[in-house]
Amino acid sequence: MPFFVRKINIPTIFGIYFGMKTDKKTDKKNLNVHFIGVGGVSMSSLARYLLSVGFNVSGSEIAPGENLEKLAEEGVTIYIGQSAENVEGKDVVVYSDAIKEENPELKRAVENKSYVLKRAELLKIVSENFSKKI
């Protein structure tokens, strides 16, 4: 696990949101989740899922694409280009193995003490909320 990833206790994604001690934990609409590199199949699916259950979702990608247009139409805030400003005010930042440590969004999320999760960690959390797993 990279040095910059905060290890947190997460019983469920919907019970105590990401283990956060905040007044936001009772209202998903006030919890801001950002995906660095949201254009891929897995990251966009996780973004759609969190949006569908009521979270505030945003994501960034280095270049525009059809999948990003669809995400935007569904209600995900999309940023083209990856900039530190994109993660300001975000409570949780999700990234995949394709994202390098020097990524400006990832670096700022760590500086801001946002909860930083790998895509695989979020996928595990989400899957724990279903009785049948594939």
What is the predicted function of each stretch?
Residues 1-3, 17:
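N-terminal, intrinsically disordered, basic low-complexity segments enriched in Arg/Pro/Ser/Thr
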Residues 14-122:
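N-terminal leader/targeting and accessory segments in enzymes
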Residues 35, 124-134:
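Walker A (P-loop) phosphate-binding motif
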